[in-house]
């Protein structure tokens, strides 16, 4: 049953993400916010970086990366969300997993965007390799690790705190 829930949730969430109103009102503003956060992080050591919409750019060199669909962490979050929804657990635990998972994926994604921005300026060939192979795998691996850590922190089925050793009279 969890596999069926996972597949249905995955398909539904991806279908919702692709809807034009969701793209316009949720995904594009979210992606622009990720670009802004990436610029703020970069500005701590490079004042020439700025964000305009979904583009992270360098004012002096003109180098820029555009954060396109698939590069904003949304797909990794969808996979994690579907996995959490399919796992038997209480809603409190699911919401904690979703919240912490969102943070973990987006922190790694900002690191990804900033590193790719500078890698592009250093060597476009290495940028392409890191963008297409290394970081795609690492973002999904991040989601998997978050999921496994979340599952590990779930209480065991039938885990009654009063039945633990040392708690009985």
What are these regions (language model features)?
Residues 1-169:
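Hydrophobic N-terminal alpha-helices or hydrophobic patches in metabolic proteins across all domains
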